[in-house]
């Protein structure tokens, strides 16, 4: 035990509500609000102010958000309208510092607003088949203010995105043909982005569903939440900044799937086979380029790489026996790589990598539930994460290296029992074990020269929990 944390100290409170008002037989107004207060602290000397620690990361979040949604449909259900608006404000006081730095405090404020409307018209027949026509518009606004005076970082970002979308889906019991597209104008991009999509479904028999899909999208060259994080590496702060003339990252995805259902007496079965391929153009990559002008922090720059490809196959199955037993499991094999090796370290002797970091070739999951009596539920679940490569920056170690991690199987058990207290009021008591086999990283860095980003695998070692939930 070196006195430094791998898991943060966490305190959180959440309060919220969701309700609705039926304004008529054919319309409804839904509204919700939530408040989240969260405190996180990691590093060493947790009982002292963060600037008295060798390494400290401390965050105080206050989050308020809410939304309104109004839906209306005609008695014949041919016309449907949905109007929505939501907003969220985040206030954050932070400390990201090393070596008892008094100037590593920061403040962040972020306001996000989304508003839009959607209209759907159902055709009894459109050209050759019944169809649903969907059209809509949406506006996104984000105002970010982030300041860390000790690192000379001052971010002022105002983002406006106006969007319009249109699609038509022809469908009957055997066929479904969807064609549509979306137009986005982002104020940090000098052109309108068109993102088409298409989907073809065919049911040769009732219980077999074949589907071919294409979709596209983009990531804007703006500051994201992960860019506001300051990592500690080798006793120094590490920050992310964007390269000049950074372009948007665009994706093109194709998938082909077969979804099959079958009943065997009291057993219900489902098997899904899917192949997928995604091409990323101007993919975002991070490369260490040295220190800032004041030599206060190491800089990693977000740049455009040439491209990347992700391709793989997923197999997923479900089995249910009455309401007594349910089992679901899936496994995915995929390859994720850049179209050419990308540099990630400023050390010229460190080779560029073609594989994308933190993308295992194999991963999977399973869930199993058993309810011998209605109030009792026994749930067993697990996730498998295959080997992958992660960045390990010098500090505790003498040189930047790409580490090949071991694989992990993380299994959990939860037992719950529901007690009916009064009419619609139920008390649930639960207990269980997380990470039963203690599949956990074994090679954490030690001391104040550590790389705080060198963490992989399951987020918790073996742990035990108990809880209570009141439902009404």
Regions found by a protein language model. Name each.
Residues 2-14, 22-79, 87-110:
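Flexible loop and strand-edge segments within Gram-negative outer membrane beta-barrel domains
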Residues 24, 128-132, 138, 147-279, ...:
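Structural signature of Gram-negative outer-membrane beta-barrels, strongest in the C-terminal barrel
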Residues 26, 73-80, 122-132, 174, ...:
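Short loop/turn motifs that connect adjacent beta-strands in outer-membrane beta-barrel proteins
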Residues 35-39, 74, 87-91, 121, ...:
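Transmembrane beta-strands of outer-membrane beta-barrel pores
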Residues 59-65, 87-177, 305-311:
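Outer-membrane beta-barrel transmembrane domain signature of Gram-negative proteins
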Residues 80-96, 211, 245-303, 309-311:
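Membrane-embedded beta-barrel scaffold of Gram-negative outer-membrane proteins
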Residues 171-176, 271, 276-279, 297-393:
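Gram-negative outer-membrane beta-barrel transporters
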Residues 281-282, 384-393, 417-472:
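C-terminal beta-signal and adjacent terminal beta-strands/loops
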């Amino acid at each position: 035990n070196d006195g430094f944390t791998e898991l943060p100290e966490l305190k959180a409170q959440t309060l919220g509500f969701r309700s609705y008002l039926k304004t008529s037989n054919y319309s409804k107004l839904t509204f919700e609000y939530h408040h989240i207060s969260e405190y996180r602290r990691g590093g060493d000397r947790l009982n002292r102010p963060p600037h008295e620690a060798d390494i400290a990361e401390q965050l105080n979040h206050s989050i308020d958000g809410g939304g309104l949604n109004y839906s209306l449909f005609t008695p014949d259900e041919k016309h449907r309208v949905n109007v929505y608006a939501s907003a969220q404000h985040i206030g954050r006081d932070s400390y990201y510092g090393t070596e008892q730095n008094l100037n590593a405090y920061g403040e962040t404020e972020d306001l996000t607003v989304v508003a839009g409307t959607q209209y759907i018209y159902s055709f009894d027949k459109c050209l050759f088949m019944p169809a649903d026509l969907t059209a809509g518009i949406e506006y996104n606004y984000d105002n970010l203010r982030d300041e860390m005076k000790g690192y000379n970082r001052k971010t002022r970002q105002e983002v406006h995105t106006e969007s319009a979308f249109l699609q038509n889906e022809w469908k009957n019991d055997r066929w479904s043909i969807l064609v549509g597209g979306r137009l986005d104008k982002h104020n940090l991009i000098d052109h309108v982005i068109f993102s088409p999509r298409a989907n073809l479904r065919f049911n040769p028999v009732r219980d077999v569903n074949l589907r071919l899909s294409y979709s596209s999208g983009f990531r804007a060259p703006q500051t994201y939440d992960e860019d506001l994080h300051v990592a500690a590496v080798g006793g120094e702060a590490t920050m992310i900044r964007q390269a000049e003339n950074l372009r948007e990252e665009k994706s093109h995805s194709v998938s082909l799937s077969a979804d099959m259902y079958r009943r065997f007496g009291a057993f219900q079965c489902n098997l899904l086979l899917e192949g997928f391929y995604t091409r990323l153009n101007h993919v975002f990559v991070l490369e260490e380029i040295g220190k800032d002008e004041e030599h206060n922090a190491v800089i990693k720059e977000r740049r455009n790489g040439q491209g990347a490809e992700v391709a793989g196959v997923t197999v997923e199955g479900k089995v249910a026996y009455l309401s007594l037993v349910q089992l679901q499991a899936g496994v995915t094999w995929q390859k994720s790589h850049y179209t050419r090796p990308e540099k990630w370290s400023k050390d010229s002797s460190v080779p560029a990598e073609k594989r994308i970091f933190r993308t295992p070739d194999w991963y999977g999951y399973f869930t199993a539930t058993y309810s011998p009596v209605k109030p009792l539920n026994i749930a067993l679940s697990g996730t498998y994460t295959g080997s992958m490569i992660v960045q390990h920056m010098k500090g505790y170690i003498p040189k930047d290296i790409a580490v090949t991690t071991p694989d992990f199987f993380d299994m959990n058990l939860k037992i719950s029992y529901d007690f009916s207290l009064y009419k619609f009021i139920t008390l649930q008591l639960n207990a269980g074990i997380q990470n039963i086999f203690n599949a956990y990283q074994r090679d954490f860095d030690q001391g104040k020269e550590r790389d705080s980003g060198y963490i992989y695998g399951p987020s918790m070692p073996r742990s035990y929990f108990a809880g209570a939930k009141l439902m009404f």
